[in-house]
Amino acid sequence: MERARITVFDTTLRDGEQSPGCSMNVHEKLRMAHQLDRLGVDVIEAGFPIASEGDFQAVKGIGAAVRRPIIAGLARACALDIERAWEALKGAARPRIHVFLATSDIHLKYKLRISREQCLEQARGSVRLARSFCNDVEFSPEDATRTDRDFLVQLVQAVVDAGATTVNIPDTVGYTMPAEFGEIIQMLRERVRGIENVVISTHCHNDLGLAVANTMAAIAAGARQVECTINGIGERAGNASLEEIVMAMRVRPDRYPYDTAVASEHLYPASQMLSEITATPVQPNKAIIGRNAFAHEAGIHQDGVLKNPLTYEIMTPQSVGVPDSRLVLGKHSGRHALSLRCEQLGYQFERRELDEVYRKFVVLADQIKNVEDHHLLQLIRETRVQTPRIPLAHVEISPAVIATGTGYAVPAAVERHPLEITLHSAHDHHAEQEDYLWGV
C-alpha cells in the first residue's frame, strides 16, 4: 500500500524570522534557502514582500536562485499586498501566494473592526485576485482555532469556492489541544464541499508547548501539509519544529505511515547554520538536534548504549546528520581535524581563511577542555573573512535519498541563477505598516 505524502512547508525565513533577535538580511536568507533546498523541503516561505524592501528582495532573489521547491510569499487579504507579492514571486519557477485574514471574533472586533460578512467578502475577493496572478494560492484564516466553528466552515467554503488550492489552519496563539485540533481538521473534511480537492495544512504555535503534538494530531486527522521551522523558532514561544515532526513520522511509521521528501541527514547542518546566522544557540536538551540529544551520563545508560545503542537511542546520530562524536577537538588538534569538523557543519575554507579560524581555535582550546560545535560556530561568526557554505555541487545525495526511506529524490545540485541584489535589512518594517502586519 502506497504511503500518503506529507508536504513540508518551511517558514523559517518568514515566521521564524519574527522570533526576537532572529532577523536575517537578504544574503543570509539566501544562504538558508539553499540549505533548506538541500534538506528537501517542499515549500519555502521566503518572506512577506510588502513588509520591507529587504523582504521583497529576499523573496525575489530566492525565487530566482532556488528552483526546485515552491517559493511562497505572504500577503494580507488586500490588493496592495497581493500585487506586491506577485511582483516578487513572478520570476520563481514554482510560485505560491499565501493570503491570510483574521477570522476570530476578537480579531474582527478589536483589530480589523469588520463584520463576519465583510470578512467573508474580503477573503473571497483576495483569493480570486491572487488566482488571477498565480495558480497556486494558499489561504490562512488567522486565529482559526479561536474562530466560531460554524463561521470557520463558512469561511473555508468561501475560499475553496473562490479557488484556493491550499487551506491552512493556524493555531496562531498556541491555544488548542491536540485532540481538539484534530477534531477541527476532521470537521472541515466532513462539512466543506470540495475540500477533497484542496490540501489541508497546519500552522501551530508553541505557546503551551503543544505545537508538534497538535501538528501530529492534525496529520492523523487528514492534514497533508505541515508548516514548521528549523529549531522551532518563531513568534513568541516559536513554531512547530520541523526536525521533530519529520523524525516523529520516521521513528513511528506504525502510528504515522506517511512519507516526506526531507533528507534527514541534513537536519543538524540546517540547525547549526540557522544558529550561526541568527546568533541564537540551540538549547542543549532540544529534541533531535540539541547537544545532549545523544549524550548519556548515567552509568546504566552508558553500559546499555555501549552494548547496543538501541537500548537508549530511538534513532542514530547519523540519521539526523550529527557529526561523529568520536572526533574530540582540543588544544592538540590540528588543522585537518578542525577543517573536517567545519566541513561536517557545512563550511569550507581557503587556506588563508582556515589559518585565521585555526589561530582563534588554538587560543580558545587553551582555555577550555573541549571545543564543541557551538564554540566553532562562534569562532566562524567572529572571523572577518568570508565563510562560504560548501558549494551545492560538492554535496552528493543518493537518488534514493540517503537514510530517508521515502523514495523521494532530492537533487544533488541546484542550478544557480545570476542574482544581482542589494543587501537590505530583512526587517525594516517599523512605522510603515499597520500593527497587524505580521500574522498567521
Residue ranges of predicted features:
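Short, ordered loop/turn segments at secondary-structure junctions
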Residues: L13, F48-P49, L74-A77, L101-T103, ...
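A mid-to-C-terminal "edge-of-domain" accessory segment
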Residues: R5-I6, D10-T12, M247, P253-S425, ...
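Alpha/beta enzyme core
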Residues: I6-V8, Q18-V43, F56-A65, A79-I200, ...
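Catalytic alpha/beta core domains of metabolic enzymes, predominantly
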Residues: T176, E183-K307, Y312
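Short catalytic-loop micro-motif centered on adjacent basic/acidic residues
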Residues: V43-G47, I70-G73, F139-P141, S201-H203, ...
